[in-house]
């Protein structure tokens, strides 16, 4: 199973936030802003007989306008994936719909937010995409494209997830809390029936 870690791409430029003059200073690489791209590459690998190298995913995002805002618009990139690969795409804010989708063999990209009043950030200090692989009734199995030895050792994060690289395990409650500030939370992908 392909795992793509954005931290391995500090020199791969990602020109995003194009509607507002480009990326913030120091945040113009896949390492800093490519979590959605990494998740998209993993989805294509897992649901099709094709690959989408991260360099090609950067180009796809830029060609389709998924890069017009900070990071990546998964609504735009997901639609592009659906058009170019044999993948069905939709989105929801219902965690139970996302869980049902996983149970049918699909994949879910979740958009989590950062810290806010009453919530200590678990997965990110900003917006961040991660790939949900499965749910066993207690925990999600997750591929976090920004997984590092240090990330979940930070104060406030210790003990809230289990890690067996490259996999991360987290409760439904943690995912719901982490995603609740996002306008669109769960992006559903499945192999298209032929």
Question: What are the functions of these language-model segments?
Answer:
Residues 91-147, 151:
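Active-site-adjacent substructure of cysteine-protease-like catalytic cores
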Residues 31, 36-40, 73, 77, ...:
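Stable alpha-helical elements in mature extracytoplasmic
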Residues 64-92:
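Mid-length scaffold segments of soluble, non-membrane domains
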Residues 40, 61-68, 92-103:
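Short low-complexity stretches enriched in small and charged residues
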Residues 1-7, 11, 16, 82, ...:
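Noncatalytic regulatory segments and standalone regulatory/sensor domains
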């Amino acid at each position: 199973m392909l795992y793509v870690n954005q931290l391995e791409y500090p020199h791969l430029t990602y020109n995003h936030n194009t509607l507002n003059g480009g990326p913030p200073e120091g945040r113009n690489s896949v390492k800093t802003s490519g979590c959605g791209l990494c998740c998209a590459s993993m989805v294509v690998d897992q649901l099709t007989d094709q690959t989408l190298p991260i360099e090609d995913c950067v180009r796809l995002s830029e060609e389709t306008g998924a890069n017009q805002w900070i990071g990546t618009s998964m609504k735009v990139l997901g639609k592009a994936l659906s058009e170019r690969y044999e993948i069905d795409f939709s989105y929801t804010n219902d965690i139970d719909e996302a869980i049902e989708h996983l149970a049918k063999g699909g994949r879910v990209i979740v958009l989590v937010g950062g810290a806010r009043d009453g919530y200590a950030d678990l997965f990110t200090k900003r917006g961040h995409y991660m790939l949900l692989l499965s749910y066993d009734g207690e925990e999600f199995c997750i591929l976090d494209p920004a997984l590092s030895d240090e990330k979940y050792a930070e104060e406030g994060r210790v003990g809230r997830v289990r890690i067996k690289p490259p996999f991360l395990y987290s409760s439904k409650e943690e995912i719901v809390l982490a995603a609740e500030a996002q306008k669109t939370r769960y992006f559903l992908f499945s192999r298209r029936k032929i």
